[in-house]
């Protein structure tokens, strides 16, 4: 096992074509730090996509641990949900952060983002299951709610954050019912 890990790491270092897609994953993960959240909006906190992804993945792990006694997931399903959360916003590395209202106003952008996500999930050999999407979506909404509240608590007077907070709270509660 350790020999395999070392061999893969060595191939990554040498830019071996066998592991080309994995080099892209590492590069895209690095690029997540440069994608600002809340695109082009005045923010008092500098949230970036990598921080958001880390919080979403941590929340997914918490949700999976809390529900361990209730859910009947096998280990492969848990791993799929966890991996899905790690890569759920990769399209934003390519397309940048697009707020929901923009996607609603321009459905073609939403379609492009969904197609990009589907393609990325195929490359990563991830099952795009409804369960993984649902659990990740709840964590994603929760983190957006956290970010909106953090902006308000920091003194941001932009009414969009209050609107976002209320919208995310409503969406979060709807998803739970």
Where do the PLM segments sit?
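Alpha-helical phosphate/pyrophosphate-handling elements in metalloenzyme active cores
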Residues: 42-81
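Post-HExxH zinc-binding segment in Zn-dependent metallohydrolases
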Residues: 109-128
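Active-site flanking loop/helix segments enriched in acidic
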Residues: 26-52
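Membrane-helix exit/interface motif
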Residues: 68, 94-99, 121
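Post-HEXXH active-site segment of zinc metalloproteases
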Residues: 98-113
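Divalent metal-dependent phosphate-bond-processing catalytic cores, especially two-metal-ion Mg2+/Mn2+ enzymes
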Residues: 4-11, 16, 87, 128-177
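Alpha-helical scaffolds flanking conserved acidic
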Residues: 23-28, 72-90, 131-138
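Active-site-flanking alpha-helical
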Residues: 91, 95-96, 147
């Amino acid at each position: 096992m350790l020999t395999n890990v070392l061999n893969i790491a060595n191939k990554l270092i040498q830019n071996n074509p066998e592991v080309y897609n994995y080099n892209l994953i590492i590069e895209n993960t690095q690029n997540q730090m440069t994608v600002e959240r809340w695109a082009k909006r005045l923010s008092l906190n500098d949230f970036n996509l990598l921080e958001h992804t880390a919080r979403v993945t941590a929340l997914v792990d918490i949700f999976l641990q809390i529900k361990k006694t209730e859910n009947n997931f096998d280990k492969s399903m848990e791993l799929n949900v966890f991996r899905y959360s790690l890569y759920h916003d990769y399209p934003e590395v390519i397309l940048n952060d697009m707020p929901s209202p923009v996607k609603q106003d321009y459905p073609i952008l939403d379609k492009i983002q969904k197609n990009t996500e589907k393609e990325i999930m195929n490359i990563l050999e991830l099952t795009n299951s409804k369960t993984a999407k649902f659990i990740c979506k709840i964590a994603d909404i929760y983190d957006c709610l956290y970010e909106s509240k953090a902006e308000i608590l920091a003194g941001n007077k932009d009414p969009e954050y209050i609107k976002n907070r209320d919208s995310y709270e409503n969406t979060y509660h709807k998803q739970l019912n």
